[in-house]
Amino acid sequence: IHPSELKFQGDAFIQQVIKAANDTKIPCVIHLDHSGVKDIERAIRDGFTSVMIDASHESFEDNVAITKRVVELAHPLGVSVEAELGTIGSTDNDTEVAGGATNIIYTKPEEAVKFVEETNCDCLAIAIGTAHGLYPKGFKPELKLELLKEIKKVVNVPLVLHGGSGN
């Protein structure tokens, strides 16, 4: 669930989603995507089981500090934390809604190692050239698959790729 959906739908809708998830026999999580600390606090209060702190537009040091704060809040309550390092591109003019950036800052393997070690995040969204939003006709993202392989070799948490579907 994206933060803009949280604001639009409100708590009653979220409670129905959580009830449906809890009633199914299929293992699932209720995940809050691309969020700040305030929305994450609300999501945890409401019963989400997974959150994504997106401080990727901050400095490396601030991203670490913010992510650590969220991990310290979430983990004691059994909530998993996804973080983002580097910036995902956006094909949308409204990058806040899209969750992307106008310029991609690729994730550096050595920073990914340090980030995961310092934050204790459960999974890491990395930037390898994907972009949020509908890809314009003829648009071909330039994916750095070797960078993905390098990061996978050195990081011990699952990696997440946002913006990979072109929609």
Predicted ranges, named:
Residues S4, G10-P27, H34-P158, N167:
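Alpha/beta enzyme core
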Residues H162-G164:
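Histidine-centered divalent metal-coordination motifs
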